[in-house]
């Protein structure tokens, strides 16, 4: 697992790319510039790891486009020490970004193969989420709720009610909503029953899988 000067140079180019696309949060840009994305991908994609593109990983999932990771992270407005629920651990790349932003990360993954692989991999790289769970993302992780922030890294036709209920008052939930194409949506909890909703452009995500059993 090598991270060379060449990789680091390509990462700085990637930072410039996402900056040009409108990302301004210096902490988020710092995380993108710091995390060895090529190590989160199949070695056959290594040469392309710092292109601003999504790539396939195990279990028919993808590692999100860096701009998308940065965009969602910026919308969350994470402060150090906040409890963040991540729905869809995936490759662990977004998890690593959240860890570097100082969040206490609680992450859930539906695909067992991916969950096992990513769990051992993150600790090898030195990223320490508070809790990684295998289970149904639609249900969140209620035993550690409420959360300051919630990020969903797969598309859902609508926001799962269980996730809204696990958000603190004043908290922010970022989720791509839609079926074929998703609209990035930010919910801010104003009170026990009231949420503000803001929409930010079209994105494409793999679907959030629900456990039908």
From Swiss-Prot:
A UniProt-annotated Pfam family: PCMT
Entries under InterPro entries matching the protein: PCMT, SAM-dependent_MTases_sf
GO biological process: methylation; protein modification process; protein repair
Domain of life: Bacteria
Active site (record annotation): 64
EC number assigned by the record: 2.1.1.77
SUPFAM superfamilies for the chain: S-adenosyl-L-methionine-dependent methyltransferases
Predominant cellular place of this UniProt entry's protein: cytoplasm
Annotated catalysed reactions: [protein]-L-isoaspartate + S-adenosyl-L-methionine = [protein]-L-isoaspartate alpha-methyl ester + S-adenosyl-L-homocysteine
Keywords, alphabetical: Cytoplasm, Methyltransferase, S-adenosyl-L-methionine, Transferase
CDD domains named in the record: AdoMet_MTases
Localization per Swiss-Prot or TrEMBL: Cytoplasm
An annotated GO cellular component: cytoplasm
Signal peptide range: none
GO MF term set: protein-L-isoaspartate (D-aspartate) O-methyltransferase activity
Keyword Membrane: no
Class of the enzyme per the UniProt entry, highest EC level: transferase
Stored HAMAP family: PIMT
Function according to Swiss-Prot or TrEMBL: Catalyzes the methyl esterification of L-isoaspartyl residues in peptides and proteins that result from spontaneous decomposition of normal L-aspartyl and L-asparaginyl residues. It plays a role in the repair and/or degradation of damaged proteins.
Homology family: Belongs to the methyltransferase superfamily. L-isoaspartyl/D-aspartyl protein methyltransferase family.
Name this protein carries in UniProt: Protein-L-isoaspartate O-methyltransferase
